[in-house]
Regions:
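Structured beta-strand/turn binding interfaces of compact recognition modules in eukaryotic regulators
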Residues: 32, 53-56, 83-86, 100, ...
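N-terminal leader/targeting and pre-domain segments
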Residues: 1-47, 122-140
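Alpha-helical recognition domains of nuclear gene-regulatory proteins
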Residues: 38, 67-74, 91-94, 111-114, ...
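Non-catalytic, surface beta->alpha helical segment in thiol-disulfide oxidoreductase systems
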Residues: 98-140
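Core residues of folded domains in eukaryotic genome-function proteins
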Residues: 22-26, 35, 45-49, 76-81, ...
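Thiol-based oxidoreductase modules, predominantly thioredoxin-like and allied folds used
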Residues: 30, 53, 64-90, 97
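Eukaryotic short linear interaction motifs
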Residues: 36-37, 57-60, 88-91, 101, ...
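Local sequence-structure signature of Cys/Sec-based thiol-disulfide redox active-site neighborhoods
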Residues: 15, 36-70
Length: 140
């Protein structure tokens, strides 16, 4: 399981390696207002939110991004978000992010689960369980 706990020192003349974090059905959140809008939209639709707090410089974040995108397409009953911890530093700090990637699972704006690190099998397991619970809730 990989994770990054601090930003590496880079020289100013080095181009940053940007990864496409918002592919598939993944929504890139760039403001607190956009976060609030997405959570409200998910609550209205009865969707569970999977929020990936990530960083462009983090190797494990880059590694898990395509898998996260695949999951977003496989489970459209969930809302998949990604937050760049460097773009929304204060907001990320308010979520007590100690390492990236950190995945939060939210229902009606409240945290119901959390996963720290790029652990594909565990992420798959948690997302499948969340999707199953949403499907079960809609059948009742």
């Amino acid at each position: 399981m990989g994770l990054c706990s601090s930003k590496p020192e880079t020289r100013d003349d080095e181009p940053e390696n940007h990864v496409e974090f918002s592919a598939g059905n993944v929504h890139l959140v760039t403001t607190k207002e956009a976060w609030d809008e997405k959570l409200a939209e998910a609550s209205r639709g009865g969707k569970i939110v999977v929020a990936n707090f990530s960083a462009t410089w983090c190797g494990p974040c880059k590694m898990i991004a395509p898998f996260y995108s695949e999951l977003s397409e496989k489970y459209p009953s969930l809302m998949f978000l990604v937050v760049d911890v460097d773009e929304l530093t204060d907001f990320s700090t308010s979520w007590d992010i100690k390492a990236t990637p950190t995945f939060f699972f939210l229902k009606e704006g409240q945290q119901i689960d959390k996963l720290v690190g790029a652990n594909k099998p565990e992420l798959q397991r948690k997302i499948t369980a969340m999707a199953d619970s949403v499907a079960h809730d809609h059948r009742i």
